[in-house]
């Protein structure tokens, strides 16, 4: 997928910390992405699902529904958009769950801005090769 095509995609961001959600939106929009934000997994499920060519940026630890539960529900609804997991809780358990959920990109808080864009682009290229 060429850079121009990647930029036309919508990035669905699910994060329950409002300050982080605003920061992620700003960061992605500054890079030219279309962005939709959701404060929880249930909000995303109720308001709109990603389509082909879109990407998800999902927080791992959320109050109502954790990121992995959201990913499982989306996969159950045949949503195949690539996922970039954001977490402040790295470790072997998270890595194992990510791998079993098909998540290949993990971004660590609080260093999101250092690598988020690169991970989003890589996830989308892997999901939609040119």
Explain the meaning of each model-derived region:
Residues 62:
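Receiver (REC) domain active-site loop signature in two-component systems and cognate sites
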Residues 37-55:
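Acidic, metal-coordinating helix/loop segments flanking the phosphotransfer/catalytic sites
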Residues 109-110:
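A Lys-centered signature of the CheY-like receiver
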Residues 1-12, 18-19, 46, 114-130:
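Non-catalytic signal-transmission and effector/linker regions of two-component phosphorelay proteins
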Residues 58-59:
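Active-site T/S-Asp motif of two-component receiver
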Residues 18-36:
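Two-component/phosphorelay signaling modules centered on CheY-like receiver
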